[in-house]
Amino acid sequence: MALLDFFLSRKKSTANIAKERLQIIVAERRRGDNEPHYLPQLKRDLLEVISKYVQIDPEMLSVQLEKKDGDISILELNVTLPETEETTK
């Protein structure tokens, strides 16, 4: 019976298709808006300051902003510093 229903089923209306597409677009935009616009510049500035003191690969710096419970934001900064070879005196 399912096979018969498949062949006799009506096509989705264009309104339903448009609604589904809009829901997908809205969901993608909400997901993409989590990162503030200033975060890439903040990462560049931090990299510039750290580079004054230590040679560091840009891939070794990670900056993430996580929002929790509406009002709370957590800025996470991970820096992997290169190992230094200490010379004995």
Swiss-Prot record:
Record-level GO BP terms: cell division; regulation of division septum assembly
Disulphide bridges: none
Gene3D superfamilies according to UniProt: Cell division topological specificity factor MinE (3.30.1070.10)
InterPro entries for this protein: MinE (IPR005527), MinE_sf (IPR036707)
UniProtKB keywords: Cell cycle, Cell division
Family: Belongs to the MinE family.
Biological function: Prevents the cell division inhibition by proteins MinC and MinD at internal division sites while permitting inhibition at polar sites. This ensures cell division at the proper site by restricting the formation of a division septum at the midpoint of the long axis of the cell.
Protein name, entry field: Cell division topological specificity factor
Gene: minE
